[in-house]
């Protein structure tokens, strides 16, 4: 009798992401199920991220992924066909061995991750389980508080704002459904407020669905957000708080050793002072990448100074890499991890990174990339890990809303059990 969990076929193809760039999609088949996964891609990437294989040449302006697709079809597929689809860690480990490099540059993290996620989905489908339950077991019931990126700057936008993301967090809501309603209502009022102040062209949206008005000073978006939240009928801070992603590797001048914000140069002490002022003036509860990816000292300073009242998130600092996370934990750099599955390249390693962080008392924010697809795996992953936080853009563009809509479905499925952590997003179990 055939094993219903045996992998019978693996197919990879090139598809388009939300920016119109090629990315990898993989399907894994068993006699009784199929799992499909599409791989996201970032714009502001940390230098220590696992390598995304691109073809170069003129096709798709060099961004084609035919090599990665071929690596799945010709190298990975023959090795995993015949394996049990529920052997997630064995399959992930085998792919790492096949690749043989530290940063997955041989087969490509985009090839490996596509297979890793498709395997998990095929296994969940074979067992008749939702993905969050397959990964997280019966204890997966914490809904994430959304960090919704409603005003964009940095490399995600064409304006002069140096900070990359200005996000709202509905910490006062009672459920995920209520939270997403608050975000949506605020987003629509924000559009009106921006249009009144900056004109019609200012409400074009960026890669992640947020607005990119012609702002320069970092206080401008925060003032506009306060106004929008109040006009939407909510209390800034108490009901809807702010989160920032400075993405400061992008505005660090390596030659001068200075950070350049709104045309002004700051050393790390002065930049820390700017963050302190912002946190004192506005209801900011989380700051991501406040210093550049090698400024461990800056991260230690801000964590000591502000970490008791503000979440300090490492993205480019950690790149979801357990080695770098352990270094941060030892030094006291940051107190939360931004978890991006494609930064590390397999589901098993991403889960390890999350648990390494949890054990040290760090928060975990499950995150999208700026180049996304309709794949909603990260919604299930956020619930599977009981992470309590998700960062997946504004409530606009289907590539972002695919994740929010999946979370609405999951909360409905967990009716009576689901917990929305609200202000306890950093540690839902406290």
Curated annotation (Swiss-Prot):
<feature type="binding site">
    <location>
        <position position="370"/>
    </location>
    <ligand>
        <name>(2R)-2-phosphoglycerate</name>
    </ligand>
</feature>
<feature type="binding site">
    <location>
        <position position="288"/>
    </location>
    <ligand>
        <name>Mg(2+)</name>
    </ligand>
</feature>
<feature type="binding site">
    <location>
        <position position="164"/>
    </location>
    <ligand>
        <name>(2R)-2-phosphoglycerate</name>
    </ligand>
</feature>
<keyword id="KW-0963">Cytoplasm</keyword>
<keyword id="KW-0479">Metal-binding</keyword>
<comment type="function">
    <text>Catalyzes the reversible conversion of 2-phosphoglycerate (2-PG) into phosphoenolpyruvate (PEP). It is essential for the degradation of carbohydrates via glycolysis.</text>
</comment>
<feature type="binding site">
    <location>
        <position position="391"/>
    </location>
    <ligand>
        <name>(2R)-2-phosphoglycerate</name>
    </ligand>
</feature>
<dbReference type="GO" id="GO:0006096">
    <property type="term" value="P:glycolytic process"/>
</dbReference>
<keyword id="KW-0324">Glycolysis</keyword>
<feature type="binding site">
    <location>
        <position position="369"/>
    </location>
    <ligand>
        <name>(2R)-2-phosphoglycerate</name>
    </ligand>
</feature>
<dbReference type="InterPro" id="IPR020811">
    <property type="entry name" value="Enolase_N"/>
</dbReference>
<dbReference type="InterPro" id="IPR020809">
    <property type="entry name" value="Enolase_CS"/>
</dbReference>
<dbReference type="GO" id="GO:0000015">
    <property type="term" value="C:phosphopyruvate hydratase complex"/>
</dbReference>
<protein>
    <recommendedName>
        <fullName>Enolase</fullName>
        <ecNumber>4.2.1.11</ecNumber>
    </recommendedName>
</protein>
<dbReference type="Pfam" id="PF03952">
    <property type="entry name" value="Enolase_N"/>
</dbReference>
<dbReference type="InterPro" id="IPR000941">
    <property type="entry name" value="Enolase"/>
</dbReference>
<dbReference type="GO" id="GO:0005576">
    <property type="term" value="C:extracellular region"/>
</dbReference>
<feature type="active site" description="Proton acceptor">
    <location>
        <position position="340"/>
    </location>
</feature>
<dbReference type="InterPro" id="IPR029017">
    <property type="entry name" value="Enolase-like_N"/>
</dbReference>
<dbReference type="InterPro" id="IPR036849">
    <property type="entry name" value="Enolase-like_C_sf"/>
</dbReference>
<keyword id="KW-0456">Lyase</keyword>
<keyword id="KW-0964">Secreted</keyword>
<comment type="similarity">
    <text>Belongs to the enolase family.</text>
</comment>
<keyword id="KW-0460">Magnesium</keyword>
<dbReference type="Pfam" id="PF00113">
    <property type="entry name" value="Enolase_C"/>
</dbReference>
<feature type="binding site">
    <location>
        <position position="340"/>
    </location>
    <ligand>
        <name>(2R)-2-phosphoglycerate</name>
    </ligand>
</feature>
<dbReference type="InterPro" id="IPR020810">
    <property type="entry name" value="Enolase_C"/>
</dbReference>
<comment type="pathway">
    <text>Carbohydrate degradation; glycolysis; pyruvate from D-glyceraldehyde 3-phosphate: step 4/5.</text>
</comment>
<feature type="binding site">
    <location>
        <position position="245"/>
    </location>
    <ligand>
        <name>Mg(2+)</name>
    </ligand>
</feature>
<dbReference type="GO" id="GO:0000287">
    <property type="term" value="F:magnesium ion binding"/>
</dbReference>
<dbReference type="GO" id="GO:0004634">
    <property type="term" value="F:phosphopyruvate hydratase activity"/>
</dbReference>
<dbReference type="GO" id="GO:0009986">
    <property type="term" value="C:cell surface"/>
</dbReference>
<feature type="binding site">
    <location>
        <position position="315"/>
    </location>
    <ligand>
        <name>Mg(2+)</name>
    </ligand>
</feature>
<feature type="active site" description="Proton donor">
    <location>
        <position position="208"/>
    </location>
</feature>
